[in-house]
Amino acid sequence: MFFHAHPDDEALLTAGTMAMLAAEGHRVVLVVATAGERGLADVEPGEELARTRTAELYKSAAALGCARVVLLGYGDSGLSSDGGVAGDRPDNAFIDADSEEAAGRLAKVLIEEEADLLTIYDPAGGYGHPDHVQVHRVGGRAAEIAGTPVVLEATVNRDPLLKGLRLAGRFYRFPAEFDVRAFERAYTPGDAITHRVNVRRFARQKRASMEAHATQAAGGEGPRTLAVMLKVPGPLYRLLFGTEWYVRRDLPAGARLTHPFDHWPRS
């Protein structure tokens, strides 16, 4: 089971792993906390955007081979300009949900599915979105309630990301509000990552998942991350996006495993 905050998060962080596990015959279930109705898009925020992004989510899930999609129905908490919690969030915002109640709802799905693996996010929620931090809290507690044996924190290797951003900064002028230094605290350093999953064989499915989220490739005054990713040509796409990273907290940081179900130590 893959637990995400908004539609399109699965495409960016775990799509290759999902497609790989589905191809191996596993039942893959995608659970999403919100419909992403407050995300930046050309569609007006609110119910119309929620409907559109939900349709995009199902299209993405189909491309990845998911057997089931579950929407928990919480409101998108939004993101303030300084990267914190938005002040005008809805009454049912995911960030304001009772963590134990939300964990119970997720645990019910885990038990229904007899899930043997759950993915969440790292404690910082990757880049710090409040809903992503809540996914970490709620998902971790749900796994405890359900007795799910394997919990993986989906993340990004911070080390090459920082190198790439600093190199890009020599040739490209980032917007004034973009602070490369913020990524010094985002995601996870390489020496703490336990799983490096090679998903290059599933680049086609991962790209199709990204393409499904058309609203997230537009909107705003500058280029969107998803739009930039989709412009990368095939061979380079497989190189840049062909690895997905995870942390399993009950394993040593130097485990360096290559499949979600790998054991440590290896037999």
Where are the regions a protein language model picked out?
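Metal-dependent de-N-acetylase/amidase catalytic core
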Residues: 1, 92, 96-267
